[in-house]
Regions:
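Domain-level signal for soluble alpha/beta catalytic cores
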Residues: 1-275
């Protein structure tokens, strides 16, 4: 989210690269711009302005392209990370009541700024995800629910994505340098994927899908999703790891491999593909 403030020109270029690649919709860079994500950087009082300006960056990229491209507003249950760690900073984890208030604030701003869809990204639990989903649905906009999953190394079941459970390590790090294990959420629960789907779909959502998950996990997750959801499906897989020794991403599939593997997952129910 800080790139929107300190490097807006780069955000625009990233949007333009997606447009030039042929996408029909771009997503605002608001994955991590809820108030509780900005407060650790002393930007909490600029939350509304940052979200407004971030939508404007997406709109500028569309204008620059001269094409008719839709804009989706991104929201997530992402929490601010502890310094030099890959886990939420407990000093800035909001109460559920504050979390709900912050999501409603962000969703309202995104709607007022004209996004056509809200995409909820990387949902991997129930407690935080249902708060976000309810806040998004309150806007009346179409809501696309993006779930993340993995095949548990403990029992081979599909679960909400969890660093402890995933077979393929996403972050390459020295445990002596990073003594605390990576966590997506402070509770670090390993939750059955079907349970997550059914808990959330009982609340609502127009599209469900799998994102930020390895191809092998996405394939198995799709089977679970299709067994529990009859509506349209989206997906965009994870294709990079993060190496802390170089602070760079390691790409796991080239363009041809990505296309081939995505093609294997397309059917009449899968309507949306992202990258």
């Amino acid at each position: 989210g800080l790139a929107n403030v300190f490097s807006p020109e780069i955000v625009i270029k990233v949007h333009e690269s997606h447009i030039n690649a042929g996408c029909d919709m771009i997503t605002t860079n608001t994955f991590g711009t809820a108030r509780h994500c900005l407060e650790p950087s002393n930007l909490g009082d600029q939350t509304i302005k940052i979200n407004i300006d971030t939508v404007k960056l997406a709109r500028q990229a569309v204008k620059n392209s001269g094409k008719k491209i839709k804009i989706a507003g991104s929201m997530s249950t992402y929490l601010a990370l502890a310094e030099n760690e890959f886990r939420p900073d407990t000093k800035f984890v909001p109460s559920f009541a504050k979390e709900e208030k912050n999501y409603k604030e962000q969703a309202k701003v995104l709607k007022e700024e004209g996004v056509e869809v809200l995409i909820l990204e990387m949902l991997l639990d129930i407690d935080h995800a249902k708060i976000l989903l309810n806040a998004a649905l309150e806007t009346g906009l179409p809501v696309w629910v993006g779930l993340s999953c993995c095949i548990s190394k403990f029992d081979e079941t599909v679960v909400g994505r969890n660093f402890r459970a995933e077979k393929e390590r996403s972050i390459i790090y020295d445990p002596l340098k990073y003594p605390d294990e990576p966590k997506f959420l402070p509770e670090d629960k390993i939750i059955n994927f079907a349970e997550i789907i059914n808990s959330l779909k009982s609340i609502g959502g127009d599209v469900y899908g799998i994102m930020h998950s390895w191809f092998i996990d996405t394939r198995e997750g799709m089977k679970v999703l299709k067994s529990n959801w009859n509506g349209p499906i989206m997906f965009y897989p994870e294709i990079h790891k993060f190496d802390t020794s170089t602070m760079q991403a390691l790409i796991t599939e080239n363009e041809i491999e990505f296309v081939d593997k995505c093609s294997e997952l397309i059917d009449d129910q899968v309507k949306i593909i992202g990258g």
